[in-house]
Amino acid sequence: MGKKKKQSKKDLKRRLSEQFQSTVRKSRIKECLHPKKEECSENIIKAHSIQNNKILSKISKNGNVIMPIPKPDNPFQLTTEYGRKRATVFTGFCGHHDQMFSPIEDCDFNYEIKQVFLYIYRAFAVEYHRKMEGVKQQEEMKKYTSDSIIDDLQLAFTLAKRDMEKDKEVFDAAILNNEFNILNYVVYDFDKEIKFAATGFLTPTDDLQGNKIQNLSDFEAKMSNLYFSVFPEENKSYAIVAALKNDESLTDYITSLKRLTQEEQINFINHLIIKGTENLVINPNAWYALTEEDKESFNYSFAQIEDFFGMPTDKGYQIKNQGFDLFNL
């Protein structure tokens, strides 16, 4: 018998890349999340979760942006260039219902309640859609491996999706009743145009004073989420952080966020983005101007190494220096 050919690193990388591409492709979900299903137009579109013409056009360079999302053909590279037309898209709305976002697509931010709602609702929608796809993706992954980590990931996605379904009921009712004052929120404004934009959510476990808010290990309890949207406009930038009013465990948390200094606000937004999203776009010129040390610090933070190893955190860690500052790009 001949010797079995040893699989090269190149062959292994190619095989893993092919598996990753196949898993991503088979896990895609095309479904309009708007509650008025009977009004849906025929086609589900590739909707931008961050405004294309208004924000991505401002941040992009030569039609490209940087995102911390590996591409299917190279799942080992974290920060990657994406074309503006592909960046931040998800198949979560039909063409008709995507028009509901025109008040934030076509108008400058003016602190109006409906605008705040739409920014936060879109942040919710993309994350809920990703949890739907995440559950499906872990099912696909089981075809390639029996590693227990897949079961753990599937449980995490399933629980997050379950909790966000409860949030969806509240968002849906607000849309159906045309009643948008359902959020406790804070808006931070900055007197410069930042070179990034982001949306996402975070499930905080402790407040800024180190007090426990909720326990992620309690699988029976419904977790409360913070949703956020950060974006530049003409000569200014804004960050909206919100929780549903019926998530009373976060009421005091939102109140404490209103008392932060601007330095603490910046640290907190950096913290939210590190912990709460990959839906982040960065201006390529700003990214490539960073030193390799700064890029490594960003990637290290984004990989959440401390969380993986269960490293302890100090009281108020959310508003302390996060190791890098997106506002300085």
Predicted regions, residues:
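An N-terminal structural lobe/cap that precedes and organizes the functional/catalytic core
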Residues: 2-105, 113
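Short, surface-exposed linear patches
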Residues: 66-68, 141, 262-265
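Short, structured coil/loop segments at alpha-helix boundaries
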Residues: 37-38, 58-59, 76-77, 146-153, ...
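Charge-dense, low-complexity intrinsically disordered regions
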Residues: 157-329
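Long, hydrophobic, well-ordered secondary-structure blocks that form the structural core
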Residues: 105-164
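Short C-terminal domain-edge/linker segments immediately following a structured domain
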Residues: 75-76, 123-127, 271-275
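Low-complexity, flexible helical/coil segments
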Residues: 70-71, 128-133, 276-282
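Metal-centered catalytic cores of metalloenzymes
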Residues: 12-21, 26-35, 135-141, 149, ...
